[in-house]
C-alpha cells in the first residue's frame, strides 16, 4: 500500500511539474474514483412510510447477513413530493410504502426503475407486482368485516355487497371512504361489478351507517364493543394488534367483541391490499437496494412479517403464521392489484358523490 501511494505521489509530481493540468485532473479523478469504490461504505438508503417498529427488525437482520447498513428516513406523508423535489440528487435508493395507490404514484411520476430479478419474479406472483416490475408487494392484508359476536351471526353476511342491504340500516361503522384502504376496496367492487353498481352500493352503504365516517380501523372495533354499531370494515392486521396489545389492554376487549368475516368466498374472493417497495431510478446504491428488496421476499423475512405484523406473506411458499391461520383460511381476490390503483380516481369520484 505504501509503495502504491509513493508511486502515485511521484506521478502526480511529474504531471504537475509539466503543468499539464488536464492530465492531472484526469489522473486524479481516476485514482480518487478507484479508492472511493474500494473503500465506499456498503449501505442502502430507504425512504419509508412504514412505522419503524414494523420494519427495523428486518433491516437489522439484513445487515447481519450482508454487512450492508440500512439508513432509514421514516415519514407519515410527503415522501413522493420529497423525491420529486430532490430529483437526481435524492439519497433514496428504496421506497417502502403501504397501499397500492401510493406505490403507483411513484410509477406514475416516473420515479421507480424496472428491476430484472429472477428472485423477485419467482417469489412474487404476477398479480402482486407491477406489470413492468417497478414495484413488488412484500405483504398482504385482507380488508374484512368485523361483526359483533353478540349481535350478528357470523354467517349472516357472505359478500361485501351485502352491506348495501337495508336490513343493516344504522348498524355499520367505517372510517372515511376517501382513506386509501376504503378507496381501494371500492375500486375492487368497480372492477367486479362496474361503476354504476359500485356507486349504488356505496350510496346504500352510506345510508346504512350508524354514524358519520370517522376514526381509524381500531376505532370501528371500539364502536362495536360500545354498541354504537354491529358491523365494521377493517384490515386483518388490526385484529392481531388489538388482540395482543399490552400497552393499551382495553383494545384486547375490543378484539374479544368481534368476529372476522372473510367476504365473497363463493365468488371472486376477499379484497386484499398490499405493502410493497420499489427501487428509485436515481438510486446511488441500486444493487444494495435490489438485494434488500429480494431479502424481504425470502422465507425468513416473509415469516417475520406474518409473526410480527399480522400480515399475510406474498411468497406462496411461505405459510401464514399460527395466529393468522387460527382466523381461518380464505380465498383472496386475485385481481391484479395495480388495477386497484387505476380505478382509484373513479372510486374517489363515487366517494365524493355519495358523501362517504
What label would you give each PLM region?
Residues 144-151, 264, 272-285, 304-307:
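A bilobed periplasmic-binding-protein/Venus flytrap-type ligand-binding module shared by bacterial periplasmic
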Residues 188, 193-261:
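Ligand-binding pocket segment of bilobal, Venus flytrap-like solute-binding proteins
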Residues 170-177, 295-316:
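Periplasmic-binding protein-like
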Residues 90-95, 113-145, 161, 171-174:
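A structural signal for short loop-to-beta-strand junctions that line the ligand-binding cleft
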Residues 150-158, 190-199, 283-289:
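Short helix-loop capping/hinge motifs at secondary-structure junctions, enriched
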Residues 40-105, 356:
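Early extracytoplasmic/lumenal segment of secretory-pathway proteins
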Residues 198, 310-356:
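An extracytoplasmic/periplasmic, membrane-proximal ligand-sensing/linker region
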Residues 47-50, 131, 147-149, 155, ...:
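Short beta-strand->loop
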Amino acid at each position: 500500500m505504501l509503495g502504491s501511494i509513493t508511486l502515485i505521489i511521484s506521478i502526480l509530481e511529474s504531471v504537475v511539474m509539466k503543468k499539464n493540468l488536464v492530465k492531472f485532473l484526469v489522473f486524479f479523478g481516476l485514482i480518487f474514483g478507484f479508492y472511493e469504490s474500494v473503500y465506499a461504505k456498503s449501505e442502502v438508503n430507504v425512504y419509508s412510510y412504514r412505522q419503524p417498529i414494523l420494519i427495523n427488525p428486518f433491516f437489522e437482520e439484513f445487515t447481519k447477513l450482508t454487512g450492508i447498513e440500512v439508513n432509514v428516513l421514516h415519514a407519515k406523508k410527503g415522501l413522493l413530493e420529497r423525491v420529486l423535489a430532490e430529483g437526481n440528487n435524492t439519497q433514496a435508493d428504496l421506497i417502502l410504502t403501504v397501499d397500492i395507490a401510493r406505490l403507483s404514484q411513484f410509477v406514475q411520476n416516473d420515479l421507480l426503475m424496472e428491476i430484472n430479478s429472477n428472485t423477485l419474479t419467482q417469489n412474487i406472483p404476477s398479480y402482486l407486482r407491477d406489470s413492468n416490475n417497478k414495484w413488488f408487494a412484500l405483504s398482504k392484508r385482507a380488508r374484512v368485516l368485523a361483526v359483533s359476536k353478540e349481535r350478528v351471526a357470523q354467517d349472516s353476511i357472505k359478500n361485501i355487497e351485502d352491506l348495501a342491504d337495508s336490513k343493516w340500516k344504522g348498524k355499520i361503522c367505517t372510517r372515511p371512504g376517501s382513506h386509501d384502504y376504503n378507496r381501494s376496496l371500492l375500486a375492487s367492487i368497480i372492477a367486479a361489478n362496474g361503476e354504476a353498481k359500485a356507486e349504488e352500493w356505496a350510496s346504500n352503504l352510506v345510508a346504512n351507517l350508524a354514524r358519520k365516517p370517522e376514526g381509524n380501523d381500531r376505532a370501528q372495533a371500539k364502536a362495536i364493543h360500545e354498541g354504537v354499531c354491529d358491523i365494521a370494515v377493517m384490515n386483518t392486521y388490526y385484529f392481531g394488534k388489538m388482540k395482543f396489545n399490552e400497552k393499551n389492554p382495553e383494545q384486547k376487549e375490543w378484539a374479544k367483541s368481534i368476529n372476522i368475516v372473510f367476504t365473497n368466498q363463493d365468488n371472486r374472493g376477499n379484497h386484499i391490499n398490499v405493502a410493497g417497495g420499489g427501487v428509485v431510478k436515481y438510486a446511488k446504491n441500486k444493487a444494495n437496494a435490489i438485494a434488500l428488496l429480494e431479502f424481504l421476499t425470502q422465507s425468513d423475512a416473509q415469516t417475520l412479517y406474518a409473526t410480527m405484523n399480522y400480515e399475510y406473506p406474498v411468497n406462496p411458499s411461505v405459510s401464514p403464521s399460527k395466529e393468522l391461520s387460527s382466523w381461518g383460511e380464505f380465498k383472496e381476490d386475485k385481481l391484479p392489484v395495480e388495477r386497484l390503483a387505476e380505478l382509484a380516481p373513479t372510486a374517489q369520484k363515487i366517494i365524493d358523490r355519495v358523501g362517504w
